[in-house]
Amino acid sequence: MKKDLKTLALARLSGFRHKTVRVPEWENVSVVLREPSAEAWYLWREVLNDGDTGDEPLSVVAKTRRNLEADVTLFCDVLCDTDLQRVFTADDREQVLVVYGPVHARLLRQALELIADAEAARKK
């Protein structure tokens, strides 16, 4: 049976490229990664601009912390369970920040690559 266009357009994650991946470091669980939302990009930009007064350059430590917080903002937006529900909310960012590591960064990179895939397809 063919679904109608409205149903397809309103389906969860229908507006995002997404893919399912296994995470060996997390007991080989499957997760769904999606492209970041417009809201996440806005919050990411807000984090990067925070503390940039222009008067005095940020220290290396402050820049590193700021960049990590920005990555966590995007990570919390792109990680979904296999029911296509986001795992984290913006309220979880501090908790994720404490444990954010290479596995999280690798998953974020894969989600961001979904955008690059879209750009490559446009060029064809």
Question: Which residues make up each language-model segment?
Answer:
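Extended acidic low-complexity intrinsically disordered regions
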Residues: 1-17
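Short acidic-hydrophobic surface loop/beta-edge motif
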Residues: 17-27
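Short, surface-exposed, charged amphipathic helix/loop patches that serve as local interaction elements
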Residues: 26-124
